[in-house]
């Protein structure tokens, strides 16, 4: 019985590899098509296998103070929101084009991970996904503050999202447009050539 169970597991595993290989040969490696449920399952489970057990056991040394939470929130807005969106949904400009798509950080799939797992993913990234490494020397306080903020995402308020939008990266065009708006509102906008300064 034991030998037949092992044989069945091996056959199933080989069958799985053949199925994934056949799918890749048929569809190629394009990131345009939505991945199959099997591909998504394998990609998600790769995260768990990638994290060492001692890292999973780490606890966040940063107290959950308002200051630390705000630091994490603003850091997330500036560095993470392009892919994860300010609300952690993953519905962001770059996030929509990634494979696998960024997970919704508000959902149990992420919230049930240990602090150590989240920290490890932030610091080391995950191969074969769009998640890069943000490695730092030692135990980065910024990464631990991000863990605090990720825990807060399910309770994120509208006011916090508005504050975050001010810290999102901007293109040179966006910056120029903001500058022109500020100059106009402050009455310091340069006069366009050929336009009279005052009415006769």
Residue ranges and their predicted role:
Residues 2-73, 113, 135-150, 166-200:
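Periplasmic c-type cytochrome electron-transfer domains
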Residues 101-112:
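Short microdomains enriched in Cys/His and/or Lys/Arg
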């Amino acid at each position: 019985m034991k030998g037949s169970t092992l044989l069945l597991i091996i056959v199933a595993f080989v069958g799985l590899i053949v199925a994934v290989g056949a799918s890749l040969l048929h569809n190629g490696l394009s990131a345009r098509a939505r991945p199959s449920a099997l591909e998504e399952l394998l990609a998600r489970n790769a995260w768990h296998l990638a994290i060492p057990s001692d890292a999973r056991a780490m606890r966040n040394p940063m107290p959950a103070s308002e200051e630390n939470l705000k630091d994490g929130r603003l850091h997330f807005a500036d560095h993470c929101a392009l892919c994860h969106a300010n609300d952690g949904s993953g519905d962001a400009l770059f996030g929509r084009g990634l494979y696998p798509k960024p997970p919704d950080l508000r959902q149990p799939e992420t919230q049930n991970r240990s602090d150590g797992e989240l920290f490890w993913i932030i610091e080391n990234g995950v191969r074969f996904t769009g998640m890069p490494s943000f490695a730092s020397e030692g135990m980065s306080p910024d990464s631990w503050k991000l863990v605090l903020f990720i825990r807060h995402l399910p309770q994120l308020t509208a006011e916090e999202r508005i504050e975050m939008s001010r810290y999102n990266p901007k293109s040179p065009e966006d910056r120029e447009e903001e500058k022109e708006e500020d100059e106009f509102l402050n009455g310091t906008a340069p006069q366009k050539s050929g336009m009279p300064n005052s009415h006769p």
